[in-house]
């Protein structure tokens, strides 16, 4: 007996508004962007996934004091995003 084939209707995603503000970056993303080239230089020929793994290990190894500058950047970026989003929503609604 053959299994009944079910067909799902695909829902189309909304197109992303190019004028929408970019999302706020996390503290880890600031750290990763700053250290990605260093990790690649220390490990030539490393794959994309391995770079992420090494960065994650380095992030976990940092103390709270060492993470503080990245946390501060993330907080400032979050405020930037919220203010840009507020302005964007106000102009979009008008």
From Swiss-Prot:
GO terms for molecular function: DNA binding. GO terms for cellular component: chromosome; nucleus. Keywords: Chromosome, DNA damage, DNA repair, DNA-binding, Nucleus, Transcription, Transcription regulation. Residues 64-87 have a biased composition (Basic and acidic residues). DNA-binding protein that induces severe bending of DNA. Required for DNA-binding by the FACT complex, a general chromatin factor that acts to reorganize nucleosomes. The FACT complex is involved in multiple processes that require DNA as a template such as mRNA elongation, DNA replication and DNA repair. Also augments the fidelity of transcription by RNA polymerase III independently of any role in the FACT complex. PANTHER family: HIGH MOBILITY GROUP PROTEIN DSP1, MITOCHONDRIAL TRANSCRIPTION FACTOR A, ISOFORM B. This is Non-histone chromosomal protein 6.
